[in-house]
Amino acid sequence: MVILISFDIDGTLEVGDPPGVLTMDLVRRTQEAGILVGSCSDRPISGQRAIWEKHGIAYDFAVSKHQLPDVKAKFEADVYYHIGDREDLDRQYALAAGFEFFWPDEAVSEPWLNQDGDSKKS
């Protein structure tokens, strides 16, 4: 099963402003398990990329909020998740693009975010 997770940064990831509950180590383990990961944020794309690179995470995409439909068109996955902290931006954009939406404190307990194996296996 191929899983794609889009992360908001501010209010979602620990490196955000304000900091969120999801750690970069959690994101790294998720990516290493074979899940497609990237960011969808209000931050400039260059700033998003710099965060991933600073933490040694091989991200698959870094886009602005309105580009979530482009992510879905580019990557074939069985399920698409967006994790964010705002109703007006994160949740609305995610649902409009056909992503399932999770608040950070909900997502942290989901098994697909805490995988140890290869998510691409059936």
Give the residues covered by each predicted segment:
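Alpha-helix termination/capping residues and helix-transition junctions
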Residues: 54-56, 74, 96
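Conserved Lys-Pro-Asp/Glu-containing loop-to-beta segment of HAD-superfamily phosphomonoesterases
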Residues: 65-88
